[in-house]
UniProtKB/Swiss-Prot annotation:
Function: Component of the eukaryotic translation initiation factor 3 (eIF-3) complex, which is involved in protein synthesis of a specialized repertoire of mRNAs and, together with other initiation factors, stimulates binding of mRNA and methionyl-tRNAi to the 40S ribosome. The eIF-3 complex specifically targets and initiates translation of a subset of mRNAs involved in cell proliferation.
Originating gene: eif3k
GO-annotated biological processes: formation of cytoplasmic translation initiation complex; regulation of translational initiation; translational initiation
Binding partners and assembly: Component of the eukaryotic translation initiation factor 3 (eIF-3) complex, which is composed of 13 subunits: eif3a, eif3b, eif3c, eif3d, eif3e, eif3f, eif3g, eif3h, eif3i, eif3j, eif3k, eif3l and eif3m.
Entry GO CC: eukaryotic 43S preinitiation complex; eukaryotic 48S preinitiation complex; eukaryotic translation initiation factor 3 complex; nucleus
Protein name: Eukaryotic translation initiation factor 3 subunit K
Family membership: Belongs to the eIF-3 subunit K family.
Gene3D superfamilies hit by this protein: ARM repeat, domain 1, Winged helix-like DNA-binding domain superfamily/Winged helix DNA-binding domain
InterPro entries: ARM-type_fold, CSN8_PSD8_EIF3K, eIF3k, PCI_dom, Transl_init_fac_sub12_N_euk, WH-like_DNA-bd_sf, WH_DNA-bd_sf
Length: 219
């Protein structure tokens, strides 16, 4: 059985491909689509950017709640640059409003890898992620990505703090997911970074026509 998101995606896709892409009359449909993404833990960046673009063209239609949902969904797709793209489409005045200001701050903490500070700030603003299904799990996935490319070994306690101090069983779940192992000293072996460094051979193909044109211009 198709989810509401899947059912809406086809219709929204038609809207975005047609001449009505930036018709403000479509905002209600697109805003419902954003809410569906939040509830069903789904994601459609193109549609969300279209909403923000419509807000740029039609400031009177701006919806703070919808914009907050879009920003939070973009954070769930780190390390991709979606959050930066969305942020750049929001005017400075609206960036200073609650809850957008708080979400931008949380995003900055994540992008700069201040993970413990992120969880502390989120704890003070739990209402921000109400209705954003899977938000914390997506953030933890991003944090594990950063840990995986940064550390060879990490203390169990530090990893738990970076993941927001979940239950030990949850930390174990993330360790198992990425194949990380703990030794007797409480150190977790992440990855041998030296083994993952591989030289790249760069081969550039130049056809005869390109060479002949270069020779002709040099004569």
């Amino acid at each position: 059985m198709a989810t509401t998101f899947e059912q809406m995606r086809a219709n929204v896709g038609k809207l975005l491909r047609g001449i009505d892409r930036y018709n403000p009359e479509n905002l209600a449909t697109l805003e419902r689509y954003v809410d569906t993404q939040a509830r069903e833990n789904a994601y459609d960046l193109e549609a969300n950017l279209a909403v923000l673009k419509l807000y740029q063209f039609n400031l009177a239609y701006f919806q703070t709640t919808v914009t907050a949902q879009i920003l939070l969904k973009a954070l769930t797709n780190l390390p991709h640059t979606d959050f930066t793209l969305c942020k750049c489409m929001i005017d400075q005045t609206h960036q200073e409003e609650r809850p957008i200001r708080q979400i931008l701050y949380l995003g900055n903490l994540l992008e700069t890898c201040h993970f413990q500070s992120f969880w502390a700030s989120l704890e003070e603003n739990r209402d921000l992620i109400d209705g954003i299904t899977g938000f914390e799990e997506s953030v933890r996935k991003f944090i594990c990505h950063v840990v995986g490319i940064t550390y060879q070994n990490i203390e169990y306690r530090l990893l738990a703090e970076m993941l927001g101090d979940p239950l030990d069983t949850q930390v174990k779940v993330w360790m198992n997911k990425y194949g990380w192992t703990e030794n007797e000293d409480g150190q977790i072996f992440i990855h041998n970074q030296e083994e993952s460094v591989k030289p790249k051979n760069i081969v550039e193909k130049i056809d005869f026509e390109s060479v002949s044109s270069i020779m002709a211009t040099s004569q």
